[in-house]
Design a protein with these regions (language model features):
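GST-like domain detector, emphasizing the conserved glutathione-binding G-site
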Residues: 1-133, 142, 148
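GST superfamily/GST-like fold recognition
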Residues: 92, 147-182, 186
């Protein structure tokens, strides 16, 4: 068994999906804030870590795995949840990447925008989200199961769930127009 430490900031953004996957797979891990793990200010730490960004997953106090989707794929593999069929794995990766692309419009608005700035960003983002959610709903319907690639969740499911869930901070009713995605989040 590997020692796992997920390092991030105190915000809801890129560490939720890995934590959901690790909890689901009953993996032991520590979740640490950057300043606690590195014992230094972010500006001092940033140049020393891969790609100068978080989250990172520390494996066995030796290896640093950067980039959210790489972390998700590693954890999925470690938990034995990776699809064995290469075509299914590629389709799952496409869904994972598509979900991750939702981070850019959602995160700055949900976590940092307030007042009129929030309302303005929300209104300009909803048409794009509607199109992206329609794509995800179609993929979920084409999967024909409870989850995107079958009857058990894998990395893409946790990532999609996280982004759909935080989108409800924009408009609690927005997701209702996508009945299958709403069911996915509810279940």
């Amino acid at each position: 068994m590997h020692s796992l430490k997920l390092i991030y900031f105190k915000m809801r953004a890129l560490a939720e999906a890995p934590q959901m996957l690790m909890k689901f797979a009953d993996m032991n891990y520590e979740y640490l804030m950057s300043w606690d793990y590195f014992d230094d200010d972010w500006e001092m730490v940033k140049p020393t870590i891969p790609f100068q960004q978080l989250p990172i997953l520390i494996v066995d106090d030796e290896h640093q795995i950067a980039q959210s989707t790489s972390i998700m794929r590693f954890l999925q593999r470690l938990a034995g949840m990776e699809p064995q069929d290469p075509v299914v794995a590629a389709k799952a990766d496409a869904i994972l990447e598509s979900a991750q692309e939702l981070f850019r419009p959602l995160n700055p608005t949900v976590n940092f925008a307030v007042g009129k700035d929030f309302e303005s960003k929300k209104e300009s983002m909803l048409p794009e989200l509607s199109s992206r959610f329609a794509d995800l709903e179609r993929a979920l319907l084409n999967g024909g199961e409870k989850f995107f690639m079958g009857d058990k969740p894998i990395a893409c499911d946790f990532t999609v769930y996280h982004h759909l869930d935080i989108s409800r901070n924009l408009d609690p009713d927005f997701l209702c127009q996508f009945s299958r995605l709403s069911e996915f989040v509810r279940d």
